[in-house]
Amino acid sequence: AIYTPSDYAMGFTEKRSVVTNAAVHKGQNYVFNIDLKDFFPSVEQGRVMKRLTLNPFNFSPQIALLISGLCSMRVKREQPIETKQHDLDKQFMYVLPQGAPTSPIITNMVCDTLDRRLAGLAKRFGLRYTRYADDITFSSMHYVYSGNGEFTKELARIINTQGFVINEAKTRLQKLGSRQEVTGILVSDKLNVTKKYVREIRSLLYIWD
């Protein structure tokens, strides 16, 4: 079977990019960005294995265990856990490695439910929603982004129940009239790149010349 990421996943899939991600949010009064903390290491082998046993893959548990193991790496837990299994299980866990070529598409697979629930939340509040890897964006013509409001509380609840944590340091609300940026693309009026990006490209061209 061929896997196709959700309509809201804009990264690491054919015919989608930072540009198509940004285009969804062009010309909105409010652009709300959040980041998922430690995105790839947050996905443990067990979650990958379970996903591989579901549609459209339907692998046997044995095959799913093998594939998920090949795509994971062992890391030490910050806090050992209580378990009846081998002592190593108390100290270590197996997670998706940052930078591995397999990790991005696997996170898209694992995040199917997250995308579906966040898209449902967006529809409920009349918002636009996309996700590019760990970079989540909502936008709208109206304001619903109060820190203690119903939308933000439900947003945090959904993300936490899906095994992720919001990186509060990277949360930002951008209003029309200020610089609105989505995955490095300016979206206030028309799609454009930032001056910083232009400077970086010029520097690279100078080095290569």
Question: Whereabouts are the PLM-identified features?
Answer:
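Conserved polymerase palm-domain catalytic core
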Residues: 24-133, 137-165, 171-175, 209
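Residues in well-ordered beta-strands of folded domains
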Residues: 11-13, 68, 174, 186
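Short capping/connector residues at structural and topological boundaries
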Residues: 17, 101, 178, 187-192
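Flexible glycine/acidic-rich beta-alpha junction loops that bind and position SAM and/or redox cofactors
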Residues: 174-182
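Glycine-rich, flexible loop/turn motifs
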Residues: 8, 92, 169, 178, ...
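Active-site and adjacent loop segments of nucleotide-processing enzymes
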Residues: 181-209
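Active-site-proximal segment of RNA-dependent polymerases
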Residues: 1-40
